Structures are given as C-alpha cells and as structure tokens.
Amino acid sequence: MGLSTNLHSLDLRSTFFTGLRTSPIPSNFIKISSISNPRRDISTIRAQVSTISLETSVKQRQDEIESLFSKQPSQQDSDRKRNGKSSKNGASGISSGVKLENIRKSYKGVTVLKDVTWEVKRGEKVGLVGVNGAGKTTQLRIITGQEEPDSGNVIKAKPNMKVAFLSQEFEVSMSKTVREEFMTAFKEEMEITEKLEKVQKAIEGSVDDLDLMGRLLDEFDLLQRRAQAVNLDSVDAKISKLMPELGFAPEDADRLVASFSGGWQMRMSLGKILLQDPDLLLLDEPTNHLDLDTIEWLEGYLQKQDVPMVIISHDRAFLDQLCTKIVETEMGVSRTFEGNYSQYVISKAEWIETQNAAWEKQQKDIDSTKDLIARLGAGANSGRASTAEKKLEKLQEQELIEKPFQRKQMKIRFPERGTSGRSVVNVKNIDFGFEDKMLFKKANLSIERGEKIAILGPNGCGKSTLLKLIMGLEKPVKGEVILGEHNVLPNYFEQNQAEVLDLDKTVLETVCEAAEDWRSDDIKGLLGRCNFKADMLDRKVSLLSGGEKARLAFCKFMVTPSTLLVLDEPTNHLDIPSKEMLEEAINEYQGTVIAVSHDRYFIKQIVNRVIEVEDGCLEDYAGDYNYYLEKNLDARTKELEREAELEEKAPKVKAKSKMSKAEKEARKKQKMQAFQQAKQKSKASKNSKRWN
C-alpha cells in the first residue's frame, strides 16, 4: 500500500516528543551523601528528576509503539514450536476432538476418578452422567486444563484447540450492555479492533518520523488483512442474528446485563459460547435456567452442529434428543454406552445382567475348586488335589470379574397430615403485574384435592409469581386467591429456598427440625442419597456451596408434613437418581401437587393436568402432558418432530422372544407407567369444564 494512499484518510498531527532519544541513567546519578548545599542540591535534584521523567516518558512511549508491531514469522514459529512441545496432539491417534486415557484424580486423599477413558470425535455428542459428586465436572476441567490429572493422558487433535466451556457458575459483566457482553465472545476480533485504533493514533502522531510512519502503515495494512481473515465486519451481523434466536428483542441490545434475570443472563452465556465457533464444545448443565421453548431451540441448534460436544445434564429428555453416546462415571470408573439416554438405560441393565452372570459363574468355579482341594487334600488323592490347586491358581491369575455395583434406590414418601377438603385453591378474576408489565388479567383457576398440575410457559410470563400468589406472598391488584377451608396445609419449595436456610445450624439439624415421625437413620439415608456424606452432617450451613444448600433445602422440603405441595423448579440441582426418587414420591402422594418445571421428562411422570400461562391468561388442559401436546398444535408439532428424530436414531426393536431379561423389565416398566398415566388422565377428564 502506497504511503500517500494511507496518509490521505488520516488526521495527522505533530507531536512534542518526536525526535527525542533516551540516554542511559547512571546507577550513581544521585548521591545523597554528597549534598553540601541543600537548596542548590535540591534544585539540581529536581532538574535531574525532571530529566529522568521526560526520558522515562519517552522510553515508555517508544515501548508502547514497539508493542504495536506484530511478531516476525520466525519468532511466531518459535513460539508455536515451544507451545507444541507440551501438547499431546493428533499424532497420538485422534483426528478430531479429544480423548481421555486412564485418568486418575484425587482431592485431599479422596480418589474421585480412578480409571476414566473415553473420547469424543467430530459429529459425536457425548453425555456425561453420574450422581452428584461423581467427577463429571472435574473431567471437563481436566480437558480445559483448569485441573491436572494425577495420572493418565489428555490427547487433543491439535495443540492449540479452541475449547468453549459453559460452567454451572456462569459469568457475565453486569456493567456491560447486552451487545457488549456478546462482543466479549470475539476476543481475537476485539484485539484487532483495539490494535487498529492504537496504530491509527500512532500514525497520526508520527508525521515527523517517516521511517516510523512507514513501519506503522505496514502494520496497519497487516491488521486490516487480519481483520478480513477473521471476518471482522460480520461480528455485528452474527450477534444480531443470534439475539432473537435466544429470545432477545432488538431494543435489548443497549440494555444493561444487570437489568435481566438470572435465566436471561444464562442465555447470554450460552450465546457467547455459540458465537465462538469452537473446536470442542463443553456444556455443564446448560438447561438449568431455560424455559421449554428455549431448551427446544437449543436442542435444534446443537443438533445442527458438527463440532465434538460433551454435555453434562440431568435433563433426560435433553440427553435423549442430543446424545450419540453416554459415558457413565460410577465409583470413579467410566463406561461408554452407544446411543442416547433411553438406550443407555436398557444397555446398562443388560450389562449388569451379563456382568452378574459372569461374576456368579466365576465365584462358583472358585468355590467348587476350593471345595475339591479340601476334599482331596490328603492320601491317595493328593495328585488330583495338586491339579485342582493349579486350576485355582489359574483362575486367580486371570483378571477377576468384579461384582457390578448397583446403587440402592432409596424409597421415600412425603409425610401427609390428614386429608384436605375437596376445594384446595381458587383463583378468581385476578389482575397482577409490575410497573412495566401486566402478568395476569382476569385470570381464573380452580384446583381440587388429588390433582397434580404442571404450570408451563416461557420465562418471565408469571409462573413463579402465580405460585407466590397462591402462597400469599404476593397480593393481586384485583380479584382474590382463596385456599380451601379444610386442612389445606401447603409445603412450598421455591427456587431460592436455599437462601432462607439458617446458616448457624448444621446439615443434620436443619432437616431434623423440619421432620415429624422420621427416624434419625432415615434422615441420614435421605441426606446420603442427596450426596451429604457422614462427615458433612455436622457441618454448618454457612460452609456449604450453593448447590449443597439447594440440595439441603430439598431434603428439608421432603420431610415437611403437608396436604399441598407447591414446587418451583424442584429438579434444578438434583441428579437423575434423585429425580427418580422425587417422581416416585410425588406419584405416591395422596395430596395435591402444583409444580413449575422445565424438565419435560419429570413433567411427563407426575402430572394429570397442565396449565399454560399465555398472554396474561391461564389456559387449562385437563389431562396429562401428552394430552397437552395433542391439544396444543405448536407443542405437538415440535414433539412429533423430536419423536421422529429419536426414531431414526433408535436401533430396530427386537422380537419379543429375543429380548433380554433387562429389556423385558424395561418395557414392563414403560407399560406400567403408561397405564398409570392413562388412569390419571381419566380421573382428570371430568374436570375439563371446571374453570372459566
């Protein structure tokens, strides 16, 4: 690029420091011991200090200008070689993605991961499953380099792999606007933009030094080519395209992040991840704060991506929809199962059945051989005994088959205090809203004993507010909310339940004080199921993490007597076994249940009636979740599309005679659940005309 061409569009001005050069400063420049005339020497010192300041300023200015220039190719190559030495790359046998090999990790003497081996390649979406505390997030942190394994290898397809990681504790800057927050996803692009501005300012200040100006113009040209290479002009377009897909309106771009709820801030974090176009995508509980519409959008978006993907989620429907294989971590050991979550459940049952049979056969061989040795140990049979001993040695030299670990499913029941009257809740013509938004306008709802209701709707539509109105924590502007007169005893689980725990109490005290007619051992068993080990029972609540407090609040909720359960996102911090425990407890509960949840799998298991919050009204679907899908055309269309996609992924169904025992049990369980849902639907249908 010609010098005159570059100068034409720039506002060039002289600068006062052009031409100045620095001089070395002697180490003995100022000697305090030589001062004889204080006033004269102080003046001298001031002059010297002034000279030092000017020369230092010039030196700093020159350093700043030199820092604007890109490294020479030879230096970049050298850096790349140094970086490459510490990376395990594709030469180790993978062409894309990442592979974990024999990973072991301990914390303070407690082994979390004993033997973890699995890999994810381009086009694969791996679901990591396991109970809370199994080490799933630790594996992601090892992949990103945030943690180092005690032993084993992390093999990456290329040394400078771009890994995007959305952790459970997402970070956003409250002082930025939404657009500025999304811009942080483009780190390289923003660095180029910032450097272009600095180089342009340096050019404007170097008109008296043509050599320097020539170098700066070359750098400016190089940066412009880099900007074109990273498609800098498309940054705004990418953000503008993604924002509405995440649910943001165009006018939201200039709103502060702090003005949005936690759920919307989670969307921003997801958006930044999606904008990075990574080589490997790691997602840790991505659906926790999203409504159903956004979860379905996210599923559709991720399904289209070819990038290797690792997902930690307790959302079984989400895992079903996305995953091509499941990696289970149990007792520190990983096992890989092909297919989605539902296929994993069947495959895991088959594996346990096969492993149990092999272990029993091995034990039978060992026991019979030992018995033979004991019977033939003396006299004329000593030769046969020796042969049997060799057989036993051979059996023991082989790799012994371990008995498969089977976690005991704890069965609990919500304590009930009698039976409520037939009428439980009546919402009559209520109006409610805030200054900038009306949530309900002449809304009506009638709930009777024994109904199990899901409240559905997008984030911000008023689902949680409706629960607060029912509980009397909010008052309607017009209309009234009436609880039934006879023995309606609510037990309320709200999203921020953990925030109201007594921080001075211990874990065990917190649950024991809420419980009635519970044995101490049963309470400890419940706490253990929720991942509170024996050494944590006497720990103060103030010392618990956010997730631990949420699980403790759930345990407290589980032991509180009631006739009405009111649940606001109860599954957010629960692992899959805990969700199954909760589902079973709700199904056996004889009282009334009102639940807000984005977990479709959970909703399908428990409800016999659906209320959808839409445009300030309460739309009533007097049947289970499947009935809601049948009647709601948009929801049904999306569900049919998902079912079709799952059908394509699923293996062909075996003939009944060829099914394993595990598969037969799984299908028997599915039929029983379908039968129970049909009964609930029949019971609910009589209420179809109940509300106006």
UniProtKB/Swiss-Prot annotation:
Sorted alphabetically, which Pfam families does this protein's record hold? ABC_tran, ABC_tran_Xtn
Compositionally biased spans, kind Polar residues:
86-95
Q: Which family does it belong to?
A: Belongs to the ABC transporter superfamily. ABCF family. EF3 (TC 3.A.1.121) subfamily.
UniProt GO molecular function:
ATP binding; ATP hydrolysis activity; mRNA binding
**Residue ranges of the ABC transporter domain?**
98-356, 425-640
Q: Does the keyword Transport apply?
A: yes
* Binding-site residues for ATP, renumbered to this chain: 130-137, 457-464
Keywords assigned by UniProt, alphabetized? ATP-binding, Nucleotide-binding, Repeat, Transport
Region of interest: Disordered: 64-95, 644-692
* SMART domains cross-referenced by the UniProt entry: AAA
Q: Where is the composition biased (Basic residues)?
A: 680-692
Q: Which Gene Ontology terms describe the biological processes this protein takes part in? A: response to nematode
Record-linked InterPro entries: AAA+_ATPase, ABC_tran_Xtn, ABC_transporter-like_ATP-bd, ABC_transporter-like_CS, ABCF_ATPase, P-loop_NTPase
Protein name from the UniProt record: ABC transporter F family member 5
Which domain of life, per UniProt?
A: Eukaryota
